[in-house]
Each structure stands twice: as C-alpha cells, then as structure tokens.
Amino acid sequence: MNHMVRYFGRCLCTIALSEISRDLGVDPVTLAELRTPGCFFDIPWGVDMAGKEYYLTDVFAEGPYAGNRLATIIDASDLSSAEMQRIALAFNFAETTFICGGNSEEGFNVRIFTPAAEIPFAGHPTLGTAYLLRQVLKYSDAQVVKLNLAAGKIPVTFGRDHVLWMQQHQPVFGEQLEHEFVGEQLGVDIKDLNTRYPCQYVSTGLRFLMIPLVSLEALKRVSVDVNDLAPSVFLFAEGGYDDDQQMSARMFAAEFGIIEDPATGSANGCLAAYLAEHRYFGSSEIDVRVGQGYEVQRPSQLYLRASKDREGKFDINVGGRVNLVARGQWLL
C-alpha cells in the first residue's frame, strides 16, 4: 500500500493515501503527485530515515489525558548538549529525557532538560524513563531500575497496583522566610498563608520554596508573581480535588521555562520531607496522596511516603502511575 509521510516540525508519522483521499475527496493518484513544501513528502514505504526513536508518556496519571507529559529520546549518547536542549525546546514539555547508555547493573545514564536548561533531577522524568526502560524497551526485568542522574543514582521500584516509586535523596532544609515578606514579594494574600508552618526552602536534589496555604480554595485562587526570590515555588494545602486525596499542590518555575507544572515529583519529595520534619499531621511519618495539575487541565495524583528516624535520617518516596501515549521518529 502506498504511503505518504506528513511532516510536523521534525516529527514523522505515516498516513495511508487511501485514508487521506477518502477524507479529502481527492483521487489517490492526484494526491500522490502533490508536492507541498513543508507539509507532504512522497517517501517510499520502508526507506531508512536517520533519526532517533522517541516515546511520550504521561506520568502521575490515573487515566488518559492526565498527568505530566514526558518525551524520552532513546540512544542519545551521540547527541551534544546543545542538540538536546534544542530538542527539549521543540517538544516544549516540562521536561525531556535522553537515555545515554548504561545497564541494569550499574544503572542507566539519563539527562534531563527543561525547555530552558538542563537540570540535575526531576521526579516525573525519573519515573517515566524508568517505566520505558523496563516495561516498553525491556532493557531490564529487575524490580528496581536505577537511573544515573546528574544529582546521583536514583532507584525506581515497580510496586503493586502499577505504582512506580522513586526514593529521593536526604533533604536539605534551607532558610525560612517571613510570611508577610513572602506574601508581598509573590503577590499572595497574607490571609491565604498558613502561618502555623514556615515558608521554607527545601531540596532533595532540586530546590523549591515551600509555601503552606490555609485551604484548597486558597490554593485554587492563588496567582503567583514568580521572581528572583523563588524561581521555583511550590504551594500546598490540606484537602484534595478528589475524595481519595489528602492534599493539593501547585508549582510554578519560570526559571526553567515552566509557567505551571501539572505534576512535580521533585517538589512533592520536598513536600514529603517538609511534612515529616514539621510533623504536619502530628507525626514524623506520613503517607498521603496529593492532587496537582487540575488548574491546567492535567489532573495528576502523587503518592507520598516519608519518615524521619531518631537520628534525623529521612526515608522519602514519591510514587505514581505511568501511561504510554505515543512513539515515533525524531529526524535530526
């Protein structure tokens, strides 16, 4: 069967001529003779096109058209940093990952790019890439897949009910800021800030300013003026968008080219540490579900488990489900 290749940016997908001619009401022979630059190219079926295989996944998704979208380029070790950055900008998702070799024993080497910069760690790229390596590409059949990121080695465990868990690094608790100052600088109404808990910088590999709010309604109406005070801001409140969620959150990171992130595993790891550190639920051990992304029509659910022992050591785990969305060829 004759095929044509439709060209969108630098992404290829094949479309049967018979299907196109039927939809457009054009004779297939006439359609095959079209040569519209930048739109249709008549390429024989089976021709080897140089490029990179890529996959799209939705991470922290409980269903279709949900979660945080991730693009992953396979076999990317021969790409330069500049090429990776251009590809990440072209996809324009919150993050794009590049698998650059490795193995199941020592771990797989992965680089993470936002549309604006490379970052050492991020949550949903970690889970999405581990899912592809084990479930789709079959590079590993182990229950735990290890990723070698710029921030260090991150193990991802494939748990029950199709939930993937990543263990995050020990948290670093930074400066606490006055609530009035935070409200003035970020344009948040002081009445919406929960003054029982601090506004504090926290990092488990990527730093966020954690801002507690008084209610889900306050979280829904908040409008943040992100600036140099906190280029990555994470706001949270008790109460969920769904009945099975105990908390809700929103994340803004203009520094990395992200206006609002649908689901942020790294920030939720910081939240898990914060909740345990400040005994938010009256305990140094937490097990909660967090809703995020509802304000940007990408409903997401993250599973948080964390504890702090008597020596001050934390065990922080963030989980979620992953859905495979699409695959294709990226022409370089």
Q: PLM features: residue spans?
A:
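Active-site proximal loop and beta-alpha junction motif in alpha/beta enzyme cores
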Residues: W45-F121, L127-L332
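Cysteine-centered motifs
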Residues: C11-C13, C39
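Short, often N-terminal, low-complexity regions
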Residues: R6, I15-S18, L31
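Short Gly/Ser/Thr- and charged-rich N-terminal loops/segments
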Residues: R35
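Intrinsic-disorder-associated, low-complexity terminal segments enriched in Asp/Asn/His/Tyr and depleted
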Residues: N2-H3, Y7, D23, D27, ...
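Serine/proline-rich low-complexity intrinsically disordered segments, especially terminal tails, linkers
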Residues: C13, I20-D23
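Generic alpha-helix initiation/capping and coil-helix boundary signal
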Residues: Y7-G9, G25, V29, S81, ...
